[in-house]
């Protein structure tokens, strides 16, 4: 029995010692109890050490106090209260908003609280533009915006909010003027959709647009969203903005129009120079002051309407000569005013030019072969029809002699009063062009290639 009692005392003492060796231990002033294992010691207080330099025994932990630190059993450590998994929600605008039946409150942002349908009937019901779905007693159907029921009458918004119908849903919008209203029919002084105080207009932007060659237009600002879930502070958004845009109907360049009179041969004439040809006939034709043709700075030939004055004495009178210009490009052409005719110098290319300036013969415009033509002012009455050989041609008292363009052989020709007869000098290729610059004959100088041009300036009636 004594042994059993002793064992119980030892166990009790051991339990108490393991529980806290410093339990009921009182140390002198400036000393503190330290438990190491199952022993308690009184040690001087050293506050500067703290728990970082003091280690407690097994099953104990150091606890700092205002003026000291001590070792406490670990099982005496109070367990912290666990935080709730979800904090209590703060009151929102929906706590102060009353929506119509079958509508639920949704906080879009701090400025917008919308009442949206609590079912998906109208959400999946498609309505055309200008109408909205309304789920009434007859079920979902589309109602025009003008006849859509104003659900704001049965909607109550929280303080400082005003109800507006947005896409068929009552929506509470914050009043920016600070005026509180609970009346569904109240209209705030400043509507949230009102444009801000200053928005750029075309009055300010037009000078900058015009300087860049653009025009100013006023368009709807795509940044202002009107959807319920996209509504932001619309007061800070300009509903209409001014932009610089290109004018699709305007022209970027000026149009230059030229007046082109038409001669008797049907070819176009462009004015830039003056040609005067005076012709008199006394038994034969005489070609007076030569033709003058100037070249424009762009390299294209410019030929003026020719004025021909014709007088006859005992001979036929030809119609006023025609100067026709259909030339696309005439480069480097210089025509001097010689005594006997036309002088062409360094004519490189003359394309598509038809010049008819005959006194008494056939005027051919752009035709290489003349068939069955009768020359009306010919001395010998020559009719040329695709002729390669010209015979029995008499030129009497001619200054310019016989003008032959593209003729291979001239047979039996008599020049009665010609100074130099017919002269062709270094004509490499002369295609349907005759240039006379001689007192008594024909002179073609350094004409390399003249293509597609027909010049008729004959006295004796030959026109090629």
Curated annotation (Swiss-Prot):
Domain Follistatin-like: 21-43, 121-143, 151-173
Entry superkingdom: Eukaryota
Position of the signal peptide: 1-17
Keywords for this protein: Glycoprotein, Repeat, Signal, Sporulation
Main location: other
Gene Ontology BP, a term: sporulation resulting in formation of a cellular spore
Residues bearing carbohydrate: 111, 247
Annotated stretches, region: Disordered: 250-320
Subcellular locations according to the entry: Spore wall
GO MF annotation list: structural constituent of cell wall
Gene Ontology CC: cytoplasmic vesicle; spore wall
Disulphide linkage map: none
InterPro entries cross-referenced by the UniProt entry: Fol_N, Spore_Coat_Assembly
Record remark: domains: The N-terminal part (18-235) contains the information required for insertion into the coat.
Function noted in UniProt: Forms a triad with cellulose and pspB that is essential for spore outer layer formation.
Subunit organization: Binds to the C-terminal region of pspB.
Descriptive protein name: Spore coat protein SP65
Organism: Dictyostelium discoideum (Social amoeba)
Name of the gene this protein is made from: cotE
